[in-house]
């Protein structure tokens, strides 16, 4: 019979006498055991800007929050940094106003207020951090303080948006179609509105209006867009559009303000075919307009800034900015921006910042 004790079965034979490591390079009689030494080394956990730049946010004081992640090997983890606008082109670990190392990836960062940052982690948690306080430290007011956290989503948060009309209210969504509306006005984060099955397909987009906290819009991969009413006692939504032909597959959403594009009754949806669709919430179940932005790649993100609509694509990564009021005339185009484009933000009326993998940050000047 075979020996019952694993220590006898798997122990190193007495006859195993390999030569020194330097002589093992061309030796075929003994296995190279250098991998054991490699696995025994401690991982380098020192703070650093990782290669994958995944999310960026900016507040009204032009202070940037940047999430970078290590996505190699078995252990994925990330770091969060804060920089002033004047530091944008020479970012480093030492020059950061604040930094935070996380055990998991930092997927999304969004400013709720100028000194209040929402952070979505890869382990499904949503955290709220205070980033600036002269009361806690008058000499170094930039310091992180955890205000609250919650694990209200069964899968990692993929969508996070703050209501401009009330920055202390935000909505989060995950790919499994779970939605949460958060009240940040108290001493902790409180979910005031929750839906566990907002869509029958994968949730891919979420957008909030500029002048209201009563509603928001979501879209999914199956070509469905829904308008949600937060005032209802139970989760309540209206179907804005449902693709009966099952041809459309939405990827992103943006909601214009009253002074932007065609007014605050219009919602813009990107799809996997590189097209941007316009929906009028006053005329549900009908697309008001469809424009092709990319002949290759899908629309990964839509950002509105005054009369301009910026569309970002992946596969390949590209950026296009159109003047919607001039018939969607393209006024700026940039090809092969990153190996993978992950996030973007407008810093002023004519400057768009994109981040991603490969080429980490690109500044787009719109003339």
Swiss-Prot record:
Source organism, top-level taxon: Eukaryota
Protein name stated in the entry: Protein valois
Tissue-level expression: In oocytes, localizes to pole plasm and nuage (at protein level). Expressed stronger in the germline than in somatic cells. In the germarium it sometimes concentrates in perinuclear aggregates that disappear by stage 2 of oogenesis. At later stages, it is uniformly distributed in the nurse cells and oocyte, as well as in young embryos, with no particular enrichment at the posterior or inside the pole cells (at protein level).
Record-level GO cellular component terms: cytoplasm; methylosome; P granule; pole plasm
Subunit structure: Interacts with csul and tud.
UniProt entry tagged with the keyword Protease: no
Organism: Drosophila melanogaster (Fruit fly)
Ribonucleoprotein found in the keyword field: no
Any one of the GO BP annotations: embryonic pattern specification
Sequence ranges of the WD repeats: 101-139, 152-192, 198-238
Positions of region (Interaction with csul): 309-367
Record-linked PROSITE patterns: WD_REPEATS_1, WD_REPEATS_2, WD_REPEATS_REGION
PANTHER family: METHYLOSOME PROTEIN 50
């Amino acid at each position: 019979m075979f020996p019952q004790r694993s220590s006898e079965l798997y122990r190193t034979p007495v006859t195993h006498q390999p030569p020194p490591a330097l002589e093992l390079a061309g030796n075929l009689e003994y296995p190279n055991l250098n991998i054991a030494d490699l696995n025994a080394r401690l991982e380098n956990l020192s703070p650093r800007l990782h290669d994958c730049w995944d999310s960026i946010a900016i507040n009204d004081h032009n202070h940037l929050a940047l999430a970078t992640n290590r996505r190699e090997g078995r252990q994925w983890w990330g770091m969060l940094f804060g920089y002033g606008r004047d530091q944008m082109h020479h970012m480093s670990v030492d020059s950061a106003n604040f930094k935070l190392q996380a055990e998991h990836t930092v997927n999304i960062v969004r400013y709720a207020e100028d000194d209040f940052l929402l952070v979505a982690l890869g382990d499904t948690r949503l955290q709220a951090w205070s980033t600036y306080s002269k009361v806690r430290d008058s000499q170094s007011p930039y310091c992180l303080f955890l205000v609250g956290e919650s694990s209200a989503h069964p899968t990692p948060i993929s969508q996070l948006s703050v209501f401009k009309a009330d920055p202390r209210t935000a909505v989060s969504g995950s790919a499994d179609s779970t939605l949460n509306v958060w009240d940040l006005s108290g001493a902790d984060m409180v979910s005031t509105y929750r839906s566990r099955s907002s869509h029958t397909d994968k949730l891919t987009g979420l957008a909030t209006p500029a002048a209201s906290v009563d509603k928001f819009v979501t879209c999914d991969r199956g070509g469905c867009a829904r308008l949600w009413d937060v005032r209802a006692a139970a989760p309540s939504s209206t179907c804005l559009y449902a693709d009966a032909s099952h041809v459309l597959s939405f990827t992103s959403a943006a909601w214009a303000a009253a002074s932007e594009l065609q007014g605050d009754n219009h919602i813009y949806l990107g799809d996997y075919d590189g097209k941007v669709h316009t929906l009028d919430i006053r005329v549900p179940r009908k697309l008001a307009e469809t424009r092709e932005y990319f002949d290759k790649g899908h629309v990964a993100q839509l950002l509105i800034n005054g009369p301009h609509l910026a569309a970002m694509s992946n596969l390949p990564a590209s950026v296009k900015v159109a003047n919607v009021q001039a018939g969607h005339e393209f006024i700026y185009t940039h090809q092969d921006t990153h190996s993978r484009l992950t996030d973007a933000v407008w810093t002023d009326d004519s400057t768009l910042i994109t981040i991603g993998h490969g080429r980490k940050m690109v500044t787009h000047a719109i003339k």
